[in-house]
């Protein structure tokens, strides 16, 4: 009987516990967003994922619609025109 308890203890120590409710997170927009049925309060929906759920991006994410890398240098000189 002690051998059975020892075997069960070793078996439980080796196996990873199964957590119910833990699902694989589907990423979108180049791993910048998460596919969800509804976005959280601080997220904005953008396009749709393959499973017809919204691709939720953080509200501070900038999206380039031109397809090329944009200059993101937001220095003071680039924001305001020069005065003579």
Curated annotation (Swiss-Prot):
It comes from the Eukaryota. Its main location: secreted. Transmembrane segments: none annotated. It is found in: Secreted. Has antibacterial activity. Belongs to the beta-defensin family. This is Beta-defensin 119. It comes from Homo sapiens (Human).
């Amino acid at each position: 009987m002690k051998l059975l308890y020892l075997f069960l203890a070793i078996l439980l120590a080796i196996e990873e516990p199964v957590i119910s409710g833990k699902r694989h997170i589907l990423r979108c927009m180049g791993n910048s967003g998460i596919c969800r049925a509804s976005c959280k309060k601080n997220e904005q929906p953008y396009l749709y994922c393959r499973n017809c759920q919204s691709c939720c991006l953080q509200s501070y994410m900038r999206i380039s619609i031109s397809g090329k890398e944009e200059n993101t240098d937001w220095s003071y000189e680039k924001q305001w025109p020069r005065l003579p």
